[in-house]
């Protein structure tokens, strides 16, 4: 695939994968992106996941047209991008591996010492001339590993962004809008590191970027302000859309009835409601919704003097990603000693700028008329 006159795509699509990073459902597969800049000197940008080494090397050989690469630039050492460094070195032993000090530490950890006979350790802001193209290296630590760096090509105004601006899905399954699966990817993979992403966005703002070449998902061109704006909202923990995320667990269906009634009452008032059964839905989508919308209602049962396990897991996903700047409400259920609301609220005690609505709904086993009235009040409060 030709990206520009000099930049070629040599990545692969993975349709066999069911769980990315062992946890994220990817029904449309995954793309592992790799690029080549053809110039007086040739630079290969990253490798691909382990199972696709031969396909990747064949793609590379096809675009080289008899030439040999001069550099392999490693932006990110996670194995879905670095697993074939050894195959590359064996195929092209004269090529130079380009990374930073942390990159080479990780290469030694993954492959053992001595793999890279020819290597170039770069620092933040260093440049590398390929001829017409000059690359500037921009370090992006903890977006989302400590060694991550990006490259900016001044000639084609291309930012090679590592995992930033990536999304789930193979490239031959990209009919859907970018936002949804990019959001789920960001919240799951990068969401904890908002401060670090903000630092990268400031660096990017000083560059004249015409295209973004991520390690997952499509190359981004055209009006890049849309993608930059979303990344700014996500990484500053801002509210992307007005609405209420309702996440619930239910043992015998009674808490579910309360959650569904709340969703109905919200929609009757013209408020967007996104509802998730945490035991059955893709939890990553529920996490995505919790960060997308400005308000969150958690509904669960008291369980073993604690809360239902899926709800505890969900809240952990939120708090470990620095959940903040939101309005929260609670629906609890308990037959003899309801304590879920108190427990859930305590789990957010270290979260910043969390506001709690006045209404908490407490079910004692099953829904009552009084509970329905309380849910009406909750819906009214959430829609103000």
Question: Where would I find each of the regions flagged by the language model?
Answer:
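Conserved beta-strand hairpin/beta-sheet module of binuclear metal-dependent hydrolase folds
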Residues: 2-61, 150-153, 157-161, 255
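Metallo-beta-lactamase
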Residues: 2-5, 99-148, 193-199
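Metal-dependent phosphodiesterase/nuclease catalytic metal-binding core
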Residues: 36, 150-213, 221-248
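Active-site metal-binding motif and surrounding structural segment of the metallo-beta-lactamase
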Residues: 40, 51-98
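Active-site neighborhood of phospho(di)ester-bond hydrolases with catalytic His/Asp-centered motifs
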Residues: 45-47, 69-77, 97-100, 159-163, ...
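Short acidic active-site motifs
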Residues: 84, 282-286
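FMN-binding flavodoxin-like domain, especially the glycine-rich phosphate-binding loop
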Residues: 171-212, 216-219, 261-276, 286-384
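Short, charged N-terminal beta->alpha structural module
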Residues: 247-269
């Amino acid at each position: 695939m030709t990206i520009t006159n000099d930049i070629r795509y040599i990545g692969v699509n993975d349709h066999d994968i069911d769980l990315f990073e062992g946890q994220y459902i990817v029904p449309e597969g995954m793309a592992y992106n790799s690029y080549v800049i053809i110039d007086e000197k040739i630079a290969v940008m990253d490798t691909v996941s382990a199972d696709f080494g031969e396909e990747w090397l064949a793609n590379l050989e096809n675009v080289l047209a008899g030439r040999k690469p001069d550099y392999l630039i490693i932006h990110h050492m996670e194995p879905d991008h670095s697993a074939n460094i050894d195959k590359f070195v064996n195929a092209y032993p004269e090529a130079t591996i380009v990374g930073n000090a942390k990159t080479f530490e990780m290469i030694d950890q993954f492959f053992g010492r001595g793999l890279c006979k020819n290597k170039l350790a770069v620092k933040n802001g260093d440049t590398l001339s390929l001829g017409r193209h000059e690359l500037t290296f921009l370090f992006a630590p903890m977006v989302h590993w400590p060694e991550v760096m990006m490259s900016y090509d001044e000639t084609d105004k291309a930012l090679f962004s590592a995992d930033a601006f990536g999304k789930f899905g193979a490239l031959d399954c990209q009919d859907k809008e970018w936002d949804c699966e990019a959001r789920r990817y960001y919240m799951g993979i990068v969401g904890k590191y908002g401060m670090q992403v903000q630092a990268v966005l400031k660096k990017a703002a000083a560059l004249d970027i015409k295209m973004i070449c991520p390690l997952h998902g499509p190359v981004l061109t055209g009006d890049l302000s849309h993608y930059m704006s979303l990344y700014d909202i996500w990484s500053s923990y801002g509210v992307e859309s007005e609405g209420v995320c309702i996440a619930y667990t239910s043992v015998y269906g009674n808490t579910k009835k309360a959650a569904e009634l709340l969703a109905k009452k919200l929609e009757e008032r013209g408020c967007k409601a996104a509802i998730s059964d945490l035991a059955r839905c893709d939890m990553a989508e529920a996490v995505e919704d919790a960060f997308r919308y400005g308000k969150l209602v958690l509904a669960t049962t008291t369980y073993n003097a604690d809360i239902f396990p899926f709800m505890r897991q969900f809240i952990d996903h939120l708090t470990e990603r620095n959940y903040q700047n939101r309005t929260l409400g609670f629906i609890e259920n308990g037959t003899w000693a309801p304590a879920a609301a108190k427990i859930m609220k305590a789990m957010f005690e270290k979260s910043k700028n969390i506001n709690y609505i006045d209404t908490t709904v407490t079910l004692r086993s099953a829904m009552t008329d009084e509970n329905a009235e309380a849910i009406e009040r909750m819906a009214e409060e959430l829609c103000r």
